[in-house]
Amino acid sequence: MIDLHIHTTCSDGTDTVLELLKKAEEKKLEYISITDHDTCKGYDQLKETKIDDIFHGKIIPGIEIKCSYLKRTIEILGYKVDTDKMNELMRNFYKDKSRENLQKKYFDLLYDKCLKMELTLTKKEEIIWNPKNDWASFTIYSDLKKYESNQTKMPADMWADFSGFNRKYCANPNHVLYIDKSEDYPSLSEAINMIKEAGGLVFLPHLFIYKWVENPKEFINEIVENYPIDGIECYYNSFTEEQTKYLIELCNKKKLYKSGGSDYHGLNKEKIQLGTGYGDLKIPEDIIQEWI
């Protein structure tokens, strides 16, 4: 069993790198990749760790980069990157706009937009969060959920889960909650170039979760046809069998590599388990043999 999409406390996960390795060993995972958001700092910790004493599988160096595409934010995965080089490239890009400052800005903007919708929130100064690691949108959503009165003021899919709130509404230019982040993140081309410069392979993750996309297959093909993509995440925690089958067939047709991952975040997405997602995710090891 493998899991190539995992987050730790180096970004927005709740497991430390060591805790993650212990869980991976308990689950008998054969391959893992720590793909923290916009950083490879977790791999710095691994350099100081006797990995063989904790985890007997193999680790593929990875990263997940948020980038802008068509005035929206999407993510790409980088595998087999030089982690030192990747960290250097990310530092250089964000040198004048730290993650902490960006999240503080988004928090203030989103908080005010929610008030315009006449939604109830805790006083801004009383909301406890850490902009160095936490996402402003998740923090706001979690606070909105504390007040049942908000349910009658929010569309059902906005209230139901964070993915709907974030990817359908906060990412929708036609909705009051929209925040244009396109200037704050690298473009898709820039993000791809950084991964390539760090010697890595570029994969497209969770392609069916972008709820603002009206035609997912058209969206996927546009990126595949116009950008130097190496592979696609074909197995993901929320994919249907039909979606996985479509992506596998696309990879075969376009001669792209395949991968899969749970998008594990620990307690921040407590229903998603390492290796198995919602419990039924089974990623065959043989899909990665041609590129590892």
Report the location of each language-model feature:
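Mid-to-C-terminal alpha-helical segments outside catalytic/metal-binding sites
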Residues: 267, 276, 281-292
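Surface-exposed, active-site-proximal loop segments in enzymatic domains
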Residues: 273
